[in-house]
A protein has these predicted regions:
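An N-terminal assembly and electron-transfer interface module characteristic of large anaerobic redox
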Residues: 1-259
Length: 259
């Protein structure tokens, strides 16, 4: 790598090549997909970087797809179309579900009665979610969130713990290797980690849009009432998750991105 490719991009592109070299994936029957925000970052060149890395390693027939809303960064591929209206509800439910499980896990792992209980529950509920997501049943994820809250309660001892939040660049916050596994170190010190939330990364788009429009940095392509309606729909789902989360004794609710 060099100073033209950021550290997260180096790791992500390297992981993709490493996955193919492991032999677990057939390059001829595999597609590489990555989300794109189009932000002012060298990682916005992910598509070209991934293509270059795959070609240089001999994987010339593996298509690379960009999952993006913005124009000019989609890298469209024939045979690959996303019905966003159909998949957005399950995407939202999946993001909130994973964030909810993270909240349960990090609060429980420093209070578990027996070592390993929290990790087993985390893995169980993440594995349980996979077929539900494939069947596109967002309401079922809400039901399993409630069951998870109940089960995480059962493994916890009543204990007060110091709390530490993880902040910073998005990839470093979520990838243990990238942040030298600081979360595990904190857990071993019996410090409760306040996990980063992937939902906040997407919810900030509502704030960013309003700021850019108010500062006349972006045209109003969509009426305000449409954006407000969409935000209320999303917030309604968040409120449902907060109600379910209350069943867990150490649950910290999702907050409004505007507060």
């Amino acid at each position: 790598s060099n100073n033209e490719v950021c550290y997260p991009a180096t790791l992500i592109v390297g992981d993709i090549v490493k996955a193919f070299k492991s032999g677990r994936y057939d390059p001829a029957n595999t597609c590489v997909a990555i989300t794109q925000t189009g932000g002012q970052c060298r990682a916005s060149n992910y598509i070209s970087l991934i293509k270059k890395a795959l070609i240089e390693n001999g994987y010339t027939n593996t298509p690379v797809v960009s999952l993006a809303f913005g124009s000019g960064i989609e890298n469209e591929q024939s045979g690959f179309k996303v019905n966003w209206l159909k998949v957005l509800p399950i995407i939202l439910a999946s993001v909130l579900y994973s964030d909810c499980i993270a909240k349960f896990y990090y609060a429980a792992v420093v209070r578990e009665k027996e070592r390993g209980q929290a990790a087993r529950l985390r893995d169980l509920y993440l594995d349980t979610a996979q077929p539900i997501i494939q069947k596109n049943k967002p309401e079922d994820l809400l039901s399993y969130s409630y069951l998870a809250a109940r089960d995480f309660n059962k493994i916890c001892e009543q204990r007060s713990c110091h709390k530490v939040g993880i902040v910073g660049e998005i990839f470093l916050k979520f990838n243990p290797f990238a942040q030298k596994d600081v979360t595990s170190w904190l857990i071993n010190q019996k410090i409760e980690v306040i996990p980063p939330l992937i939902s906040d990364f997407f919810m900030q788009g509502f704030v960013n849009l309003k700021v850019r429009q108010n500062q006349h940095l972006q045209r109003k392509l969509t009426p305000d009432f449409v954006i407000d309606w969409l935000y209320k729909k999303v917030q309604k789902q968040i409120n449902k998750v907060n109600e379910i989360g209350k069943s867990f004794n150490y649950f910290i609710p999702f907050e409004s991105i505007f507060e």
